[in-house]
Amino acid sequence: MKRGLFTVTSNEQLAPGTFRMVLAGDTTAITAPGQFVNIALEGKFLRRPISVCDWGEGSLTIVYKVVGQGTEQMSRMAPGTRLDILTGLGNGYDLNKSGDRPLLIGGGAGIPPMFALAKKLLAQGKIPSVILGFNQAAEQFMQADFQALGLDVTVTTADGSLGVKGFVTDAVPQTGYTYVYTCGPAPMLKAVYDKSVTSGQFSFEERMGCGFGACMGCTCQTKYGNKRICREGPVLEKEEILW
């Protein structure tokens, strides 16, 4: 974990209520896709945990949804705004277990970390397939970003207004993939858990207090005892999850 000051370089709307923010700052503490950052906001007691969408030397990209006063405040930030951010939080995804053809499944706010994961897998010569889930076409974001990487991308919408009608599990194939990586709301993760036929890693979205394991506010039960989503997670192995 590392604390630093970051400067907003861009902040654009991707879809209604969904924004992409690029920041300049020290990203050396970020070591794996699936980690998150914790952002301090003026007038707010708790920091806001946001997953890492992408990072490079001196550059951090986050994609966030406006769900309350804090993220609404973020959506109005102009380039040049300075933010106090904790980076390198959480365990992230383990790429060594993926096999050659992993399947990446993201739903809503769980889509951004799939992008950094896809880039890292491609850099290792692996060929991921991607499923992105939305409620309706108007909410779609980042499909073009994944396609620009040369990936096979399937979009699902609950109302059928774009892509496959239904949920992400309606697009999960019976065979042809070696491993599953997923991130999204708990009901989606449970459905993927039940539908997928391989091992995998599941990233959980939980409300957090401190973001680094001190407050014990995001503890969950696993087959191997209690784990803190912010510290030992947010990524858990499929085999250890208790529903």
Name each region found by the language model.
Residues P234-W243:
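Short microdomains enriched in Cys/His and/or Lys/Arg
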Residues F45-V52, G90-K97, C230:
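Short, Lys/Arg- and Gly-enriched loop/turn segments at beta-strand edges
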Residues S10, D54, V155-T157, F202-F204, ...:
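Structural signal for conserved beta-strand scaffold positions within catalytic alpha/beta enzyme cores
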Residues P113, E205-P234:
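Local cysteine-cluster metal-coordination motifs and their immediate loop/turn environment
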Residues K2-T81:
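Ferredoxin-reductase
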Residues Q69-R207:
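FNR/FR-type flavoprotein reductase catalytic core
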